[in-house]
């Protein structure tokens, strides 16, 4: 019989219950309410999937912060600064994720970076030749037993040993973490044995790194690892799960040869591997087909998915085929049930996590009982696709004409950077090592209440404007008092750097409860790009104009770039992403023009998501980077030479895209570097990056206030790599999620660190 499965399920709860519980724990320190909430969310997830008839329900996919952090704890790979070897309690767990600063310790958090090309973030493991492993965290075993006690037989999920080591960071130059495989495997073998003893029959081992382009040496280490794992608990059936794309030929060959019972392949983003997989699958293996998109919110084309499933069953037999989501459903919102205000027609085109469970059930029934058993569902699905295809709301002829008429040679600024830099320095007269922030400032409950009051109609526009202007003035005066050189208005009016703009652009729609986990307690509510994009009126001009009127210091106009808006939205799937991005770029260009006309001399267009859009296969990079950089330049090319264009990027490795970053031709780029101790700057040095750079000198994802000496040390590291006249001083990222006291304290220390270095170099 053909079974259904999911690889993982949303963790935060339908109403962000996990976020509330985490923030309460971080404030009050009481463990019991947090653990009770976590248990409740796990149980609800298992029961919901069981009710929908999912055959293989995952366990250990839930986490309090991050599943890679859980694996760090499981294997005892705790860095020395967090009391490695001691019991891993909640305080240690969260210190690794967020840093810790109290009367007994002051430790920086571990690095965090993007999970492949998604907007989820994982904690980066740290490995050295001295790293040792031990089974230090039995969560995978405990949660299997917890589900079993509820009458739910689950398939435990582990981050695979190969991907765990590949995703880590070597703390010693030249060291390959894969060399630790021999030390790591006994921990996995122990876990598998204990899961078998607890009654597990299948275990899902995620190896998403197999989707990357790997060398023969890496693949050999993967094969050797699974030879050991398969022998550890012979009664267990291992399912190696890959996702986010097609496996390269050598990786697919390796996966098919692994001594495991099943292979999961993504058939949404990796449809090209379907035929090869069917022909190469050994007779002793099961093929899990990822037919339902786990990363986007559009309904599945049931006819196309069923055709793939039917052919697989015909070729392999029903007992050797499983129907699944392409990847974990943590990347989509929980359920459409709570979306009471979403347009009914648009809503009919969508499927969130719970609806995707229903799609899996329908597909499985169609395979098991034949097409006629789901003829009604197939007809309804086909009608929805036809209605969406022909809906006038998704097509805007004026937008399409404007994109069609773009001059491919007119996306550059008037003069080269060296000339612009001289013109801008004369205009602004900034000191060496100018200080600024990335854009957002802390948002209090009063700010959030003000936005809610306007939405509910409790406040009129005049009341709302008065409140926001007071917040902006407070932020401007604080920055002046601290001594920052370039100011921002603080963005109190913005819920999110993408949602805010989407609400003001045509072609976007919004959910009420469409929250998706970004990391830990951080959730985002991605807009839905359903149609052609245009800007009906200015979006930010009045707030920025007001902020600049309050001070003689330059204030940056703050925009989100077209690539980031694209990457952090649920994007229409009926046209190339590059086409949608060009539409957004033209809308942002109109805003740049209006900001400049309103007197803003500095405009920041943030592109933190530029790198995460890279295809996982390098052979596809050039095409993506060409249109992504073109879209950024298209959005800023109307700016005059005396207008300084800033951009910001975070969570990025820049070595392999440094040419593209230079091709953006932003006057100033600020980047997140504090957790990496300025190592990310090496790419800019090696490339001789010509423009100004603001390396982040403190980690805003942690509540700790860094000491002045700590930031000064980082600035000195930057000054060893770059000419001081091209260095800006700023935090790693925006400050929205921090509190006002810690923000002010950290910025005071940052400004003093910059002044101290200025004095030291005689600037």
From Swiss-Prot:
- What is this protein's gene name? metE
Instruction: Write down how the cofactor binds this protein.
Output: Binds 1 zinc ion per subunit.
A single Gene Ontology biological process assigned to it is: methylation
Q: What does this protein do?
A: Catalyzes the transfer of a methyl group from 5-methyltetrahydrofolate to homocysteine resulting in methionine formation.
| Organism, scientific name | Parvibaculum lavamentivorans (strain DS-1 / DSM 13023 / NCIMB 13966)
Q: Which InterPro entries match?
A: Cbl-indep_Met_Synth_N (IPR013215), Cobalamin-indep_Met_synthase (IPR006276), Met_Synth_C/arc (IPR002629), UROD/MetE-like_sf (IPR038071)
This protein's name: 5-methyltetrahydropteroyltriglutamate--homocysteine methyltransferase
- Please name the SUPFAM superfamilies in this protein's record: UROD/MetE-like
Q: Which cofactor is recorded for it?
A: Zn(2+)
- Residues annotated as binding L-methionine are 438-440, 491, 606
Keywords tagged on the record: Amino-acid biosynthesis, Metal-binding, Methionine biosynthesis, Methyltransferase, Repeat, Transferase, Zinc
